[in-house]
Amino acid sequence: MLVPAKEMLDKARAGKYAVGHFNINNLEWTKAILQTAQELKSPVILGVSEGAGKYMTGYKTIVGMVNGMLEELNITVPVALHLDHGSYEGCLKCIEAGFSSVMFDGSHYPIAENVEKTSELVKSCHEKGMSIEAEVGAIGGEEDGVVGMGECADPNECKAIADLGVDFLAAGIGNIHGKYPANWPGLSFETLAAVKEKVGELPLVLHGGTGIPADQIKKAISLGVSKINVNTECQIAFAEATRKYIEEGKDLQGKGFDPRKLLAPGTEAIKATVKEKMELFGSVGKAE
């Protein structure tokens, strides 16, 4: 059964570890992440971008697939199904479709409009027993056409959004989506500490978890980050493993062209990436 992300993140915040949010793109992705979470006894958040939602034919399809897998794979660890970087309309659709959590990305609105829209969605989510994440300060890189430059959030704006009753907050601290450029200056721990001071016990979220050095991840967790988003790293691992399979001519051997065989190495590569991240984040064994 799907659960809201709030309880697992409150526990993570208190226990000084983070829960991984791994974006799903299809059946292989979803299965790989769920099986790894179960094997490692780790709570997990399945993230769905609006683009991936369209690709998988809609949010109802995704809810059906995930709920079916939870039952068929006997998944007993806490699993949240979470809309990633949702528009106002996207959040409403996911609330209807049966997601257990949403993120409203109002970071490109003026703060007054962000506050108004966030307030409405907090009310709708909490009425349905769902959790809601909000964002202040655009995360750099490109996420389904929304381009941000890796701003640092204003701690006072973070407090204004936190006070609306959101369950966890993504604050821009110089992090970006996708691959980090060689001249990236690193995370702004000064901003993170200032945000933490303003929002108190509220779990914080780190987007763009791919390519951030392990020591910076651990420091961010010590400063209140309880949810870390990973997507690009799984995509690269999947693509590299699939390319290797084809370059070695394995798709031409026997029935190597069968999609179940063709996609298996990529699926295993996702599992290995998820395992590595769960170990780094400290969530292994936390669902026991």
Regions found by a protein language model. Name each.
Residues T242-F281:
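Internal helix-turn-beta structural module
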Residues V19-N23, L81-H82, M103, L204-H207, ...:
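Short catalytic-loop micro-motif centered on adjacent basic/acidic residues
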Residues P4-G20, Q253-R260:
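Generic N-terminal amphipathic, Lys/Arg-enriched alpha-helix
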Residues G20, G145-G148, A182, H207, ...:
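A general structural-boundary detector
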Residues Y17-N25, E50-K54, K261, P265:
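A short N-terminal beta->alpha junction/helix N-cap motif
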Residues I173, G208-T210, T232:
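Active-site proximal loops enriched in glycine and acidic residues that flank catalytic Cys/His/Asp
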Residues V3-K11, G15, L27-A52, T57-T76, ...:
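Alpha/beta enzyme core
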